[in-house]
Amino acid sequence: NEMKLSNTLGFPREFFKYADNIKMTIDSTHIRPECTIPKVEQIAFKEKLAMTHRILTFLEGYIQFPQMNIPTDFNRNEDIEELASKVRRYWELGDGIIGNMLTLLEINGILVSDANINKKGALSFSQKQTVNGNSRYFVSLGNDKKSACIRNYDLAYELAYIVATEANIQSKKFSKDEFACAFLMPKETFTQD
């Protein structure tokens, strides 16, 4: 069976043996409240994202991926705009507009996947996963919007979830929409235009 699966998918046979030995913990999952797909399908998408980590862990034997590069000195009492500014400074982005959130997240060690969710109402979601004591965030993009602007916003929204998780701020007390806006276009830049 392994051989047939390996040949059909074009994966090395070692992957199937190696993937079974990976002990992964899903620390948290964030699905946007506006997501309208049924809960049972949301569970399936979470599992697909878990499989993405298994594939990544296998590929790390051949490819060096960027390490997680997220600020660790968040203060949960800072306002949302200050938290967004802190991430921008940490990543040395200045105050300009961010054109490509996908590349920005990936070079900072956040894995972004397009799970090919061809369902209306499917939105991006995130997971924090740990394998062998190493944590990594994964973002899965919803596939019902093809606009680069919307995709950038969705990724900034998921970054807000990551920041809230790292700062240990409850979701109810943290506006991910406000963070996404402040991160993508800081107030200083907006008022200059």
For each predicted feature, which ranges?
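Short juxta-domain linker segments that transition from a proline/glycine-rich
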Residues: 1-193
